[in-house]
């Protein structure tokens, strides 16, 4: 995308959020080089941990949740899958009966995931490239967490 297209996207994403308050933009950024080496040995574990920190409280509010991620990571080396991890966290940590439906789909087949990828790119540019133009347009409508470990 050109810089102007990114600005147009950010402006439209902000307008979408302001006219649809039920939509939530949530993000988590981690400084991976500060993560201990033994944790980085299986990056899926860190990914699973980040997903739970970002989404578990939101998921716990509902009786049933359909989680539709890109199938980037499903199992950690231990064999435990992200949906199993999230489901047990909901039941045991949050003590809720939320039913988690897990439907991974490739982002090239989902406009919603493409939208999320573009939103993520705006946030990534802020933290990694020090290009904050799009992030500054969106920051008031994004709930974001930064972990430095």
Question: Model-flagged regions — what are they?
Answer:
Residues 1-149:
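Phosphate-ester processing/binding pockets and catalytic centers
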């Amino acid at each position: 995308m050109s810089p102007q297209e990114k600005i147009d996207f950010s402006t439209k994403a902000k307008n979408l959020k302001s006219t649809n308050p039920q939509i939530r933009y949530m993000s988590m950024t981690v400084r991976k080089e500060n993560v201990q080496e033994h944790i980085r040995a299986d990056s899926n574990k860190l990914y699973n941990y980040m997903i739970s920190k970002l989404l578990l409280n939101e998921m716990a509010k509902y009786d049933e949740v359909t989680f539709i991620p890109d199938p980037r990571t499903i199992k950690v080396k231990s064999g435990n899958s992200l949906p199993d991890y999230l489901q047990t966290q909901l039941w045991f940590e949050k003590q809720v009966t939320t039913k988690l439906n897990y439907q991974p789909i490739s982002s090239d087949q989902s406009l919603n995931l493409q939208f999320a990828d573009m939103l993520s790119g705006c946030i990534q540019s802020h933290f990694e490239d020090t290009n904050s133009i799009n992030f500054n347009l969106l920051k008031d409508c994004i709930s974001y967490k930064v972990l430095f470990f």
